[in-house]
Amino acid sequence: MELLRSARPHPKEKLKNVIEWFHWLLREAELYDVRYPVKGAYVWRPYGMKLRRNVEELIRRVHDETGHEEVLFPVFIPYEFFGKESQHIRGFEKEVFWVSKGGEGGERLVLRPTSETAIMPMVKLWIQDYKDLPLRLYQIVSVFRAETKMTHPMIRLREISMFKEAHTVHVDREDAERQVREAVEIYKRIFDEMCLAYMINKRPDWDKFAGAEYTIAFDTVLPDGRTLQIGTAHYLGTNFTRVFEVTYLDADGTRKLAHTTSYGISERSIAAMLITHGDDGGTTLPPKLAPIQIAVVPIYYSDEEMPLVMKFVEEVVAALKGAGLRLHVDDRRDKTPGWKFYYWELKGVPLRLEVGKRDVEKRQVVVTRRDTLEKYAVALGELVDAVRELMKAVEDNLRRRAWEELRSKIVKVQSLEEAKKAIKEGKVVEVPWSGDNQCGMKIQELLGADALGIPMDSEASIGGYDARDLACGERRAELWLRLSERY
């Protein structure tokens, strides 16, 4: 493999306006159509749907490998179920879509915003004793939220159409909290394969999931410095099992309340992946998830050259398909090679192969990496190994760049002025906090930012020195509190 052109990646000037760039990408790369005439509801186009299916397969694989079983619950939740858990209904009531009429009448129903209150009544019927636990279920479904804020494609929706929600049931708090820790590891595996960088934060009490004892969240930082929540895991304690009377017979012969968890991710993770790996030319898809891993572009300038080039392309395709690689031959005669290069770069295809008359004579192809635009000459006999090596290099580079960018955005500050300046510059700040909720909410107000919570991926404790709460100076700070502007 011979390097023909060193790295010269596209700039990222357009990503200074993330939402405008994202709309452009979704439209031009034929991923998603935002023109459907219902606010917050959008259309997945065929290329986008193939990408989504690959992400769903990743999610299913990781959950199946960790003892979860897939289920499918109805979209309708009876109001008598939804209204049972008081914290839950207070948290979701303003976002709920109600089915107020069906035919000549009927019961009052809710379009699920999430499924805790749908699943618990059924779980109650399935669990008899401790031998039935733990129970780990998941589904990938649509959920509905009556968003009143501005909606954005994949990011803030009224129909979240790729909502993976897992629900687990356990004998006690210890086992349920162990499951929350496993959920964190599950999400690490998924996001690592998507080449995403992330912070792990314990949400403050005022921002935890409605009905949870606590919430652990994954947040990523987009190029404009605003954060995007891409996953959450909740320890629900006995809050739902108590009101739905989900009990089990323990080994000692007594009936006990089960403990539950839930954890979810959605198409927000795909949005984060597209944006994180984006540039002025489009995006770069991680090779394992790309619908098309290799775009093959035959180059010929006469009818005489065409059969020679296309015959060699057949050899190239046979070698790559035989290795199980996903590829597409762009043999459109009404488009120039340069136009095709732009098109496949826009769509994020990790590698492009060019085959011209001179390449046929040398029995080689020219391979271009989408992430760096480096070019290599590769002999046909070495092609499969070279492609695998280059795809691994693309994946590693995407992941490395994402983590470097995220780490550069997180700063510790000691004063209100420093914090305001850093947030204005698109940073995530860590500030001293006493742990008092009123003080935490006051910090949010003073900074005009959102509290992400206590860091779970770095040292959360202030340590031995005498730091003061950023908002309540009379209180000694015990913890770091992360804040940012967020979507």
From Swiss-Prot:
GO molecular function, one term: proline-tRNA ligase activity
One cellular-component annotation, GO: cytoplasm
EC number assigned by the record: 6.1.1.15
Keyword Iron-sulfur among UniProt keywords: no
InterPro entries linked to this entry: aa-tRNA-synt_IIb, aa-tRNA-synth_II, aa-tRNA-synth_II/BPL/LPL, Anticodon-bd, Anticodon-bd_dom_sf, Pro-tRNA-ligase_IIa, Pro-tRNA-ligase_IIa_arc-type, Pro-tRNA_ligase_II_C
Gene Ontology terms describing biological process: prolyl-tRNA aminoacylation
Subunit structure: Homodimer.
Family: Belongs to the class-II aminoacyl-tRNA synthetase family. ProS type 3 subfamily.
Domain notes for this protein: Consists of three domains: the N-terminal catalytic domain, the anticodon-binding domain and the C-terminal extension.
Name used for this protein in its record: Proline--tRNA ligase
Species whose genome carries this gene: Pyrobaculum neutrophilum (strain DSM 2338 / JCM 9278 / NBRC 100436 / V24Sta)
Taxonomic path: Archaea, Thermoproteota, Thermoprotei, Thermoproteales, Thermoproteaceae
Gene: proS
